[in-house]
């Protein structure tokens, strides 16, 4: 990276990590569910994955790759009913959020507390069960805390690896690909498909991750550092995809 480029922010490292989620994806539908995953998906489309299909988040397929919140020429129609067809085909990669994730990848975005008498209602399970069963799923967590990365989720919305019956063909497409947080990049490549650290963002220590995770993180001592963006990637993030710096509202460090 050249000396003319200003210091890379934590949010920009997160954007790069989210873009790398789609590395090698090819011609599939990218469905990012928050600002930084959206920047990441569009960055991937402008660099390594030009065949990614992206939408406005409602019902229109973009012909171009606009900035966050901007309009662009439309090349197709993707109403909700067609999304179900894409989900069932497996040609989609969703990046969802999570209110809770456990070491096996079970995700909760439904409610806190007992199933029959929750103490706080959230979104409901939404599309999480179908997403996790049918196609690659990743998660984005903007604030990595022990409340989110917990021992046991209150309600399973997205299906984790300990729920899988390997003999049942219904689970054959289950694949939890990545978890990106404001502290690092993770997957479920630990023992018995448990949570594993792949890289920590520059300035983040292993102790910080351990202190903000309720369970042991596999591979934490050996995790590398999240890669540096290229000059072109930084230009695209700052000038093309997010000129209003919305990314810094999601991750401010």
Swiss-Prot record:
User: What is the superkingdom listed in this entry's lineage?
Assistant: Bacteria
Q: What is the effect of changing residue 126 to M?
A: Loss of activity
Entry keyword NAD: no
The protein's UniProt keywords, in alphabetical order, are: Cholesterol metabolism, Lipid metabolism, Lyase, Steroid metabolism, Sterol metabolism
Q: Which InterPro entries match?
A: NagB/RpiA_transferase-like
Q: Quote the annotated effect of residue 92 to M.
A: Loss of activity
The UniProt record lists the keyword Isomerase: no
Give the knockout phenotype.
Answer: IpdAB double deletion mutant does not grow on cholesterol or HIP, but grows as the wild-type on pyruvate. In the presence of cholesterol, ipdAB double deletion mutant accumulates COCHEA-CoA.
Q: In which pathway does it act?
A: Steroid metabolism; cholesterol degradation
Q: Name one GO biological process term.
A: cholesterol catabolic process
Cite the record's note on assembly.
Heterotetramer composed of 2 IpdA subunits and 2 IpdB subunits.
Q: Family assignment?
A: Belongs to the 3-oxoacid CoA-transferase subunit B family.
- State what this protein does: Involved in the final steps of cholesterol and steroid degradation. Opens the last steroid ring of cholesterol by catalyzing the hydrolysis of (3E)-2-(2-carboxylatoethyl)-3-methyl-6-oxocyclohex-1-ene-1-carboxyl-CoA (COCHEA-CoA) to 6-methyl-3,7-dioxodecanedioyl-CoA (MeDODA-CoA).
Q: What is this protein called?
A: Cholesterol ring-cleaving hydrolase IpdB subunit
User: Which organism is this entry from?
Assistant: Rhodococcus jostii (strain RHA1)
């Amino acid at each position: 990276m050249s000396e003319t480029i200003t210091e890379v922010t934590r949010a920009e490292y997160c954007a790069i990590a989210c873009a790398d989620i789609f590395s090698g994806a090819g011609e599939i539908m990218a469905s990012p569910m928050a600002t930084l995953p959206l920047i990441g998906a569009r960055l991937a489309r402008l660099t390594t994955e030009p065949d990614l299909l992206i939408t406005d988040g409602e019902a229109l397929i973009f012909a171009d790759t606009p900035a966050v919140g901007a309009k662009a020429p439309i090349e197709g129609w993707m109403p909700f009913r067609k999304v179900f067809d894409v989900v069932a085909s497996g040609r989609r990669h969703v990046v969802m959020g999570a209110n809770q994730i456990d070491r096996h990848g079970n995700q909760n975005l439904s409610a806190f507390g007992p199933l029959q008498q929750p103490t706080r209602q959230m979104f409901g399970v939404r599309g999480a069960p179908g997403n996790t069963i049918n196609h690659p799923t990743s998660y984005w967590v903007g604030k990595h805390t022990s409340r989110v990365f917990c021992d046991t989720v209150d309600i399973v919305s997205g299906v984790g690896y300990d729920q899988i019956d390997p003999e049942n063909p219904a689970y054959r497409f289950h694949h939890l690909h990545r978890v990106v947080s404001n502290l690092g990049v993770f997957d479920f490549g630990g023992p018995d498909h448990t949570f594993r650290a792949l890289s920590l963002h520059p300035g983040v220590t292993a102790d910080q991750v351990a202190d903000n995770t309720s369970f042991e993180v596999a591979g934490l001592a050996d995790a590398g550092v999240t890669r540096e963006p290229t000059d072109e990637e930084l230009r695209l993030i700052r000038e093309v995809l997010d000129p209003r710096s919305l990314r810094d509202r999601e991750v401010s460090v």
